[in-house]
Amino acid sequence: MSRPQGNKWIGIAAVSGFCAVMIGAFGAHGLESVLSEKMRANFETGVRYHFYHTFALLACGILHVIHPSKLLEPAAICFLTGVVLFSGSLYVLAITGITKLGMITPIGGLAFLAGWITLLLHTIKPPQHPAKER
């Protein structure tokens, strides 16, 4: 991941954070009286994991600037995929009640886990410094 790649993931994290706040506010104020308690809990779980993994995306971007690694891009992709599949499926499930969407949620959870493992590998693998120009 080059420095612009790190900045790209910081930008994506900013958009994700904005969306998490907006979706959370919509759930708390716009859906409060519409959703059942169970569906509201599903929605809130989606928002919570959306926030957690927005910070993970941000960490991938910042880490790249400090300690570059080819592993940070795949980790960030996994976190973003997890947000879309895990949180996104919970949002749609809560609003529409389509329970078949619940089958997508674990795939998003696996993407989150893959992101965390890849980030762990980044801490274990020695940094890959580009050759210095002479």
PLM-predicted stretches and their roles:
Residues 16, 20-23, 60, 82-89, ...:
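Membrane-embedded alpha-helical transmembrane segments of multi-pass integral membrane proteins
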Residues 15-25, 42-66, 79-82:
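Core segments of alpha-helical transmembrane spans in multipass integral membrane proteins
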Residues 30-33, 67-70, 96-99, 122-129:
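Juxtamembrane transmembrane-helix termini
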Residues 3-17, 71-79:
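Interfacial segments of alpha-helical transmembrane regions
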Residues 28-42, 89-110:
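Interfacial helix-loop-helix junctions of multi-pass membrane proteins
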Residues 63-99:
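Mid-chain, well-packed structural core segment of small domains
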